[in-house]
UniProtKB/Swiss-Prot annotation:
Biological function: Catalyzes the reversible reaction in which hydroxymethyl group from 5,10-methylenetetrahydrofolate is transferred onto alpha-ketoisovalerate to form ketopantoate.
Keyword Magnesium: yes
GO biological process annotation, one example: pantothenate biosynthetic process
Enzyme class: transferase
Name recorded for this polypeptide: 3-methyl-2-oxobutanoate hydroxymethyltransferase
Residues annotated as the enzyme's active site: E181 (proton acceptor)
Gene name linked to the record: panB
Length: 266
């Protein structure tokens, strides 16, 4: 696979080719997933839950994320490396810049930040300094205590209107990509059409420009036994992990995943 860049992701959106993304935390899985055709490897703060065993993503630090970014970089075969900026790592503009630089120096190609329109200043700061940014909107796990749990966002018309406006504002601030988590499928489609940058969905229907899942979820691995509605176990019927990841890539590309039952209504 040729090296995936911001430019190539934008070209995929323009051509209507779906983008595939998976979380990834080490060299072996980075090699396996990128060889299977996954375009974007996300070192998510989900590592706090699936690797460290916490009940939220909040305890994850920038240093821990940078460690896993470096591991992924060593095994990667051409995929874009996207790294989460952990909880409170962007509390001030100075912290945002320093922590983002740390992740980029570890091997990331793009930084993901969670929030809404208030992120505009941070995104502008990073973009002006050569750091591409993905804006994570909708259900933002770092704000789980404010949101009252892991709930679908944007069901009320006022919320939907605000989310559409925020997405446009963040694109204008310089966001190179948007990730929508747990939002109604119709709203996700509207946002995807409203912005020029690629929009990746998780629990956001099939009309987004691409999909992302947590690696452990799509392989059927869970400590809690709770499986989110938007997850499909791609390990079922497959002889090995790389085949399961290839099945995920194929399903996203041929529009068989996500199906209607993996999304949410308003």
């Amino acid at each position: 696979m040729p090296n995936i860049t911001v430019t190539s992701l934008l070209a995929m959106k323009q051509k209507g080719e779906k983008i595939t993304m998976l979380t990834c935390y080490d060299a072996t899985f980075a090699h396996t997933a990128s060889q299977a055709g996954v375009e974007v490897l996300l070192i998510g703060d989900s590592l706090g839950m699936v690797l460290q065993g916490h009940d939220s993503t909040l305890p994850v630090t920038t240093a821990e994320t940078a460690y896993h970014v470096a591991c992924v970089k060593r095994g990667n075969q051409g995929a874009m490396i996207l790294a989460d900026l952990p909880f409170m790592a962007n509390a001030t503009l100075e912290q945002t810049l320093i922590n983002s630089a740390t992740l980029m120096q570890a091997g990331a190609h793009m930084i993901k930040v969670e929030g809404a329109a208030w992120l505009a200043e941070s995104i502008r700061l990073l973009a002006e300094r050569g750091i591409p940014v993905c804006a994570h909107m909708g259900l933002t796990p770092q704000a789980v205590n404010v949101l009252g749990g892991y709930k679908v966002q944007g069901r009320l018309e006022t919320q939907a209107r605000q989310m559409r406006a925020d997405a446009i504002a963040l694109e204008q601030a310089g966001a190179a990509m948007i990730l929508l988590e747990c939002v109604p499928s119709e709203l996700a489609e509207e946002i995807t059409q409203a912005v020029k940058v690629p929009v990746i969905g998780i629990g956001a229907g099939s009309a987004t420009d691409g999909q992302v899942l947590v690696l452990h979820d799509m392989l059927g691995l869970s400590i809690t036994g709770r499986v989110p509605k938007f997850v499909k176990n791609f390990m079922t019927g497959q002889p090995d992990i790389q085949s399961a990841i290839r099945a995920y890539v194929t399903a996203v590309k041929d529009l068989s995943f996500p199906a209607t039952e993996h999304g949410f209504s308003a």
